Amino acid sequence: MDGPHLAIAASDAPKIGVMAGPGTGKTKYGLMRRVARLLSEGVRGNRILLISFTRVAAADLRDKVAELDVPGAEDVRATTLHAYCLSLLMRDSVLALTGRHPRILMNHERDLMLRDVGGDFGSIHDRRRRVEALLAGWARRTADHPGVAVDDDDRVFEREVLRWLLFHRAMLIGEVVPIAHRYLSTNPAAEELEALDHLVVDEYQDLNALEQDLLEVLSTHASTLCVAGDDDQSIYSVRYANPSGIRAFVSRDDVEPHGIVVCGRSPANIIEMANSLIEHAVDRDKPALVPLEADRQGDVSIVQWTDVPSEIDGIVSAIADDVGRREVEPGDILVLTNWRRIGERIRARLDDLDIPVRSYFTEEELASDDGREAVALLRLVVKANDLPAMRVLLGLGEASGRSGAYRRLLSHCLDSSLDPLDALRRMAAGERLAGLKVPALLERYERAENRVQHLRTLDLPNLVDELLPPDSDDLANLRGIALDSLEAAEAAVDVLDDIVSAVTQDDVPQNPNFVRVMSLHKSKGLTANSVYVVGSVAGILPTITSTHQAEAEAAAEEGRRLFYVALTRAVHSLVISASAAMDLADANARGVKYDKSTIRRSGDRFTVRTITSPYIAELGPSAPRGERGNSWLASRAST
């Protein structure tokens, strides 16, 4: 590709802004050509930094850099912004100087913290939203001043969260950006500000306002800052991503703008459907995507099943037919759903059929108490004073994590300058601590300590067998990771590191030999010949949890962008699947709205009527007419 791609590569402008739609080749043919040109002109690789938000996008950048046949390419760093900030803070001892510890909380550990802080901060959902605002530097809107909490409740919340984290010698991964921003903004002599000549940023629309400002700070002394993105693909409002940031950057007077609209990935009819969909976005004023091959048509189906079990059966049958009779490689199949449960059931069914498959849902290995307990025990085997791990064990088996009792323990410890582990240890030895009674916590502490002491006597293979027994379905994935780790592990800490890395990073490969099942969010940056979008019903796509009109409207807008991303993953075939009914319990758990008059009894369960996602009606004349699932399966069998 030439034209805008070549112009991006050749530009010597100090600031370059690229607005590029999905599948337009901006990364491979624009940004990578730019890096290759800089290297060929003598720029040292370690003076070039490539940044993206997601690990998938960063891994894609690393792969493409590795393909450059230019001296110095091996020294170019391609990473996520969070990974870069963490390494910067560790290297410059900023964390140590500020008394912070790089013990990163997992999601379930973070939720325990949010329950423990107390206060009138609403439900756990409200608290998650508030902590994301904290991690975004309180930049909930682009007009907010990054890094500053203005609201009194926000200030109190921030103080309580930081006190918990300091007391537990832990931090949230999202903290590294605000800390790095504060450090670099207030230390103009920092070496990092002189370390870069060229900064290239991909997927800029996924960053929040604080992160976007941090990149401006990082590029203070750089020769060039090249930013690429697409506001139509901004899908991270949960962490206050700023889609208007890319529009504002490209329109600045000091920025050389470029646009790419020709899509070489998807067939013309799928591109037309995607264009029709995104044209319904509020206040959108952009040119439509243009197919590279106007006469290339994809195989598109929109199907509806009688209920969710029928949908799972049908999709599994279709994939089995793809892999078997049609000889489609499993790695060419991508299954996307906003409903984790249906995705996990599809994965399990494919696995039963011996079809290679992996799912990629956030920390899914730790969805059960058994998984959380196993990892917490392993952490304590490795490090006896891992307080967040003990906090997990103290709260297991109770919906609130025994947060009331734990708050009493924390309050006593703060007043007495005691470590919670020391307090529990002293009470277990028979000492009475004035005014403190937490029998449930003490019982679980003693049980945990006994198990940890026993586990420390075992060699690595037996340690894995006891923590992750082979007969547990809930622990099967964790056990698989641990067994793989045993091949090279020399100590328990090696197994723990491999488990934590696999569970929290969970990098999705671009070219695997297995079917990939994941959320629509996780699909960003991926491409597949065959894409199945499953569970496409109102209430799931979009998922709207807020009762506030403005927030609900924003969620609906982002849901459309999310569906747009999903459609444009497809290279050859696309199946959009929905059901006409789901279990009442599932509808309530997911917050799906339904008419009570549609509740029906089906055996020992109740179902409610569902309708297809409202976005399906926005796909335009290029979309095929919907059909019943069974009829669709029958028609596939005859072709």
PLM feature spans:
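ATPase/helicase motor core of nucleic-acid motors
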Residues: R252, R296-G298, E327-R456, N462-E466
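Conserved helicase motor core of SF1/SF2 NTP-dependent helicases
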Residues: P22-T24, Q205-E279, P287-E293, G539-P542, ...
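Accessory N-terminal region flanking or inserted into the helicase ATPase core
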Residues: M1-G30, R47-L49, R115-E203, A209-V217, ...
